[in-house]
């Protein structure tokens, strides 16, 4: 006999977020905790690949990459790659019930480039800067 389960379909983009769209950050962890408390065992999400023209999650340019819109900016700040003032002062839109993808694209990539530049300035972590294929030679 199969075990039954229940859950919800909700895209990551629908999570609450102060930066134009929901992310895989604290709001996602809080939502999973809520699902557990509600006795749910499944959270079905829409595809999370990067989108292109039209911003449809079903029209991704990659089967493997993740959508940079879902990167948690607060976590990047906690990791020392951003300062809160790098993104908190940006205009992420005026309606919390609507995602302005054109504005999001313009603002999010600007902030993510700052985080990437900070990442490049960090010292390498021992063991992570070694090619994975060394053992295969």
Which role fits each region the language model picked out?
Residues 2-137:
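Acidic/aromatic-lined carbohydrate-recognition and catalytic surfaces
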């Amino acid at each position: 006999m199969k075990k039954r389960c229940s859950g919800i379909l909700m895209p990551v983009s629908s999570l609450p977020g102060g930066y134009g769209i929901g992310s895989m950050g604290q709001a996602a962890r809080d939502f999973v905790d809520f699902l557990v408390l509600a006795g749910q065992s499944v959270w079905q999400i829409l595809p999370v690949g990067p989108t292109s023209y039209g911003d449809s999650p079903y029209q991704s340019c990659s089967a493997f990459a993740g959508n940079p819109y879902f990167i948690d900016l607060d976590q990047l700040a906690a990791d020392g790659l951003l300062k809160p003032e790098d993104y908190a002062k940006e205009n992420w839109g005026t309606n919390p019930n609507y995602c302005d993808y054109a504005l999001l694209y313009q603002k999010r990539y600007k902030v993510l480039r700052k985080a990437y530049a900070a990442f490049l300035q960090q010292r390498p972590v021992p063991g992570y800067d070694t090619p994975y294929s060394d053992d295969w030679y």
